[in-house]
């Protein structure tokens, strides 16, 4: 029985990782490519960051999806290994904290706040745009993405 649960969890995580990656890759061919990386980020896939509240497999799924996306698109971002490693770890931490949230409203905060304050460190450094300006750009884009997806969540997850 435990193997079935593990297989089920891995499958769900893989589906979420794939969906995240596909959404990021799709965005790079749409007219919104410049919003995928940089001081203003509006990633369509970031709407998925509220999924850990409903599904524990979303925690590793989002991490792997972000990691794969950042690897594939590292040539576009210009941030290299720091974005691949640190960006993916920020997503993992945000997903974990989202999973622990007591309500869907609190669940929206970790991806918005952590991406805003942490990802802005290297984006600001490499882009030359002031840190707090970058924080506002990344937090704003993250908030838009997350708030669009939040209505699909149940009121609270046990």
Question: Language-model features: where?
Answer:
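Juxtamembrane loop-helix boundary motifs flanking transmembrane segments in multi-pass membrane proteins
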Residues: 2-6, 63, 127-132
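Hydrophobic transmembrane alpha-helices
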Residues: 2-57
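Membrane-helix boundary elements
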Residues: 53-75
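Small-residue packing motifs within transmembrane alpha-helices
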Residues: 9, 13-17, 57, 61, ...
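Membrane-embedded alpha-helical hairpins and interfacial helices in multi-pass inner-membrane proteins
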Residues: 25-38, 47, 67-158
